Amino acid sequence: MASLMEVRDMLALQGRMEAKQLSARLQTPQPLIDAMLERMEAMGKVVRISETSEGCLSGSCKSCPEGKAACRQEWWALR
C-alpha cells in the first residue's frame, strides 16, 4: 500500500503519469490511487491533465461502445 508521499515522489520523478501507471508501479489498487490523486488535487498538490486523441481517422468513436472516453487520456502531474 502506497502513501500520499510515495505517490507525490513518483510523480516528481516521472513528471506525469496515468493513474493506472502509478497503480502498477506502486503495487497499489487503482481505486485507492484514484482516491489519493483526487485528494491531492483538492489540496492543490497535483493537477489533472486531460488529453483527447484527435487521431481517430476512422471516425469509429461514434459506434464504439465506450465512445470518446476510450480515446481520452488522463495524466497527473505535480503542481
UniProtKB/Swiss-Prot annotation:
Keywords: DNA-binding, Iron, Iron-sulfur, Metal-binding, Repressor, Transcription, Transcription regulation. SUPFAM superfamilies: Winged helix' DNA-binding domain (SSF46785). The keyword Transcription regulation applies. Iron-sulfur cluster binds at residues 56, 61, 64, 71. GO terms for molecular function: DNA binding; iron ion binding; iron-sulfur cluster binding. Coiled coil: none annotated. Belongs to the FeoC family. May function as a transcriptional regulator that controls feoABC expression. This is Probable [Fe-S]-dependent transcriptional repressor. It comes from Klebsiella pneumoniae subsp. pneumoniae (strain ATCC 700721 / MGH 78578).
